[in-house]
Structure formats: C-alpha cells, structure tokens
Swiss-Prot record:
It comes from Rubrobacter xylanophilus (strain DSM 9941 / JCM 11954 / NBRC 16129 / PRD-1). Monomer. Binds 30S ribosomal subunits, but not 50S ribosomal subunits or 70S ribosomes. GO terms for biological process: maturation of SSU-rRNA. One of several proteins that assist in the late maturation steps of the functional core of the 30S ribosomal subunit. Associates with free 30S ribosomal subunits (but not with 30S subunits that are part of 70S ribosomes or polysomes). Required for efficient processing of 16S rRNA. May interact with the 5'-terminal helix region of 16S rRNA. This is Ribosome-binding factor A.
Length: 122
C-alpha cells in the first residue's frame, strides 16, 4: 500500500476515533482525552491510537476506559470507512507528550527559570 494512502487512512481514522472518544461519558476519562495520532499496520488489520490526557486524568484509567469502548469505536470506524477489514484498535498514551514535557523541564533547569514562567534567575 502506498504511503499516501496509508497517511490518508490514518488521518481519517484519527478523525473518526477522535469524534467517538469525545462523545464517551466513561468516568475513567475524567481528564480531557485527545487523539493525537493513529498508526495502521501494513495490512490494515491493526491500528494503534495514540492519545494525550489533559486536566490531570490517570493515564492507566484512561487506557482502560478507551479499551472498554474499543468495540463501539471500531464499529463507528467500520460504518464510516470503506475498508475491506476494520482495523482492531489498540490505545496507547502518546510518548511525544511526555518527551516534550521532559525537554521543557530540562530547558527550564538549564536556563535557570524559577518555575513561574517569567524566566527570572534564582
């Protein structure tokens, strides 16, 4: 399958899954859950959905909540796409968000910021 087609499918899945996640009312998803990306396997049988969690939610609880809704979300993907086979969904926290946080923390430490964001030296 071409890279362009794969990217197009991933973008469409991100849109569908994001809409479905936004409509969930699971208490385990207390923080704002944002779908940040989707990666499909070469044969489209599996899709890893990456998400970030804002507003202090528990990442493991969020994963459990998303996994419990995977069937409903997968059904929506099947109904809204013309794929021969609907990919099996797996939810993973987006590692990029944690990396960015670590980098920002390191930069603040190196630059001597006092943590209030105004860049003053201690």
């Amino acid at each position: 399958m071409s890279d362009a087609r794969t990217r197009k499918i991933e973008a469409r899945l991100k849109e569908i899954v994001g809409d479905e996640v936004a409509s969930l009312s699971d208490p385990r998803l207390k923080g704002l859950v944002t779908v940040t990306g989707v990666r499909v396997s070469p044969n489209l049988s599996h899709a890893t959905v990456f998400y970030s969690l804002l507003a202090g939610g528990d990442p493991e609880e969020a994963r459990e909540g998303l996994q419990s809704a995977a069937g409903r979300i997968q059904a929506a993907v099947g109904a809204q796409t013309r794929l021969k086979r609907t990919p099996r969904l797996r939810f993973e926290p987006d590692p990029t968000v944690e990396r960015v946080t670590r980098i920002q923390r390191t930069l603040r430490e190196v630059s001597g910021e006092d943590g209030d964001g105004n860049g003053t030296q201690e």
